[in-house]
């Protein structure tokens, strides 16, 4: 396998991005990309030499200042001013892995030859990626229309030798890093600042990062839910394929199939049951988990289109000799999708917490709170409180961002997507889902021990054996905070196959 990923018109998807990340591949512009970028830049330079008409963002001001004409001698300064003036983010810093994704997605978008960027500017972004020079970017500041202006301004500052970067684990001034590599700051030419700042790469990077985790934790929700089902002495009939073939939602069918595969050979599931039905949180896993799968799959399709698109403005079309000002920077497709994914992930957490509640309730020959000597020991009473608190927070965070819009730029930008807020909220929900599922695994693994000497399937027994090496059985009260943190780390280290990135 090559250790280089060539930026080209070849479609990026979750699988290829995961491969780039896991294998720590370097980036390089393909010859096709280099030609496309250079042709577009040459066209724009010639156009500006012979054209005196105002062209938005190239020889005019920005936003509501679009009617202010800028002289040719100030075109470079205009772009530099744009980057500096728009670098006004605040709040928490964007995680390093998402910043690196932003670099990848910005390079991809600029490579198609519709942006007018200099080849050396894109190459410098490639250098940043390959050398893990990660600009310091903040989570707050983007309206998700005119693109992710503030975050992308911070992404672009180091090109000018401005701002700060994370390099070799330390925050350092960008100018120092340029000096370290003997690089000169980039002198931006006409339109370049706009090409860099207009775009949806903040929302895009968050979405890709969350999606990769969502597919993994959708799988883990099925697995942990299946362990809970067995621990609760649940019935297998609700997962019979006949039920799901007459309501053939893809996610529902996949979930039922997966649960049956997890349970293959289990003694616990095959033992005679005294109860007729199980609560919905067990019985309806295919319908609930499956609906979240279908939502995640829809979101994947939206982001696949977006990360292979040109999202700056104006766009340059050499073949038809046109420079067209449009609105590809508007993040509405992503904003709606991120809100949808947030709801889907919150629901996986909501139903997980309900299974945890059932397990500690002293039902079906399980001890109250899953511990010997209940009363003297409180056992797993309070982890359920924690899960309930987090599930409630997720419900609050799942309130859509995309229904809001605030007028900006003197009314010129009178409708915005707020997709960036949706992106950061969705990541918080994703992180919360990890914690809720970790708490369910703690409870399920404890409860299933009370079904011994009956065994589960070989797969589940192997999974639980690996888990027990990290988190021992609870025999008497201990500080469970540490168990929660160890369980989260265990789930984070759990690897899934790449083909699951298209099957939540």
What do these predicted regions represent?
Residues 104, 112-134, 143-152, 157, ...:
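Well-ordered mid-protein domain cores that form the structural environment of catalytic cofactors
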Residues 74-77, 121, 214-216:
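Short, low-complexity, polar/charged sequence segments that are solvent-exposed and flexible
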Residues 2-25, 29-36, 40-43, 48-51, ...:
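C-terminal auxiliary extensions adjacent to catalytic cores
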Residues 2-52, 79-138, 229, 244:
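Glycine-rich, flexible loop motifs
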């Amino acid at each position: 396998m090559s250790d280089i990923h060539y930026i080209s018109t070849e479609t990026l998807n979750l699988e290829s991005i995961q491969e780039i990340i896991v294998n720590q591949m370097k980036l390089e512009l393909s010859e096709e990309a280099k030609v496309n970028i250079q042709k577009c830049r040459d066209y724009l330079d010639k156009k500006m030499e012979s054209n005196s008409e105002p062209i938005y963002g190239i020889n005019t001001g920005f936003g509501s200042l679009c009617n202010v004409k800028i002289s040719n001698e100030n075109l470079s300064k205009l772009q530099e001013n744009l980057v500096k003036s728009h670098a006004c983010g605040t709040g928490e810093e964007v995680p390093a892995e998402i910043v690196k994704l932003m670099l990848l997605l910005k390079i991809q978008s600029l490579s198609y030859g519709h942006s007018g960027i200099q080849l050396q500017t894109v190459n410098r972004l490639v250098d940043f990626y390959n050398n893990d020079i990660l600009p310091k970017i903040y989570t707050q500041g983007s309206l998700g229309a005119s693109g992710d202006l503030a975050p992308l301004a911070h992404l672009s500052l180091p090109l000018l030798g401005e701002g700060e970067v994370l390099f070799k684990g330390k925050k350092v001034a960008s100018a120092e890093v340029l000096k370290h590599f003997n690089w000169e700051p980039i002198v931006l030419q006409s339109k370049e600042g706009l090409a860099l700042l207009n775009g949806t790469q903040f929302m895009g990077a968050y979405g890709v990062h969350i999606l990769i985790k969502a597919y993994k934790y959708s799988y883990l929700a099925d697995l942990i839910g299946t362990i809970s089902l067995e621990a609760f002495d649940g019935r297998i009939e609700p997962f019979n394929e006949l039920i799901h073939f007459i309501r053939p939602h893809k996610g529902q069918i996949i979930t039922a199939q997966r649960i049956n595969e997890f349970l293959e050979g289990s003694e616990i599931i095959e033992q005679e049951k005294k109860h007729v039905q199980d609560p919905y949180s067990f019985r309806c896993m295919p319908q609930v988990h499956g609906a979240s799968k279908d939502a995640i799959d829809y979101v994947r399709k939206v982001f696949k289109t977006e990360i292979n698109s040109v999202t700056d403005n104006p766009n340059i079309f050499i073949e038809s000799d046109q420079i067209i000002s449009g609105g590809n920077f508007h993040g509405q497709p992503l904003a709606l999708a991120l809100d949808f994914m947030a709801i889907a992930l919150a629901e996986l957490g909501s139903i997980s917490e309900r299974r945890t509640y059932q397990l500690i309730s002293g039902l079906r020959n399980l001890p109250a709170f899953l511990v010997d000597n209940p009363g003297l020991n409180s056992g797993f009473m309070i982890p359920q409180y924690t899960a309930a608190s987090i599930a409630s927070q997720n419900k609050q965070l799942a309130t859509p961002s995309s229904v809001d819009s605030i007028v900006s730029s003197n009314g010129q930008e009178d409708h915005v997507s707020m997709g960036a807020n949706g992106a950061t909220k969705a990541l918080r929900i994703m992180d919360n889902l990890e914690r809720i599922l970790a708490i369910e695994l703690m409870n399920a693994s404890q409860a299933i021990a009370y079904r011994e000497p009956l065994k589960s399937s070989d797969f589940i027994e192997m999974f639980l054996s690996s888990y027990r090496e990290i988190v021992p059985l609870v025999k008497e009260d201990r500080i469970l905070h540490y168990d929660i943190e160890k369980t989260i780390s265990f789930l984070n280290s759990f690897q899934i196959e790449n083909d699951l990135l298209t099957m939540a």
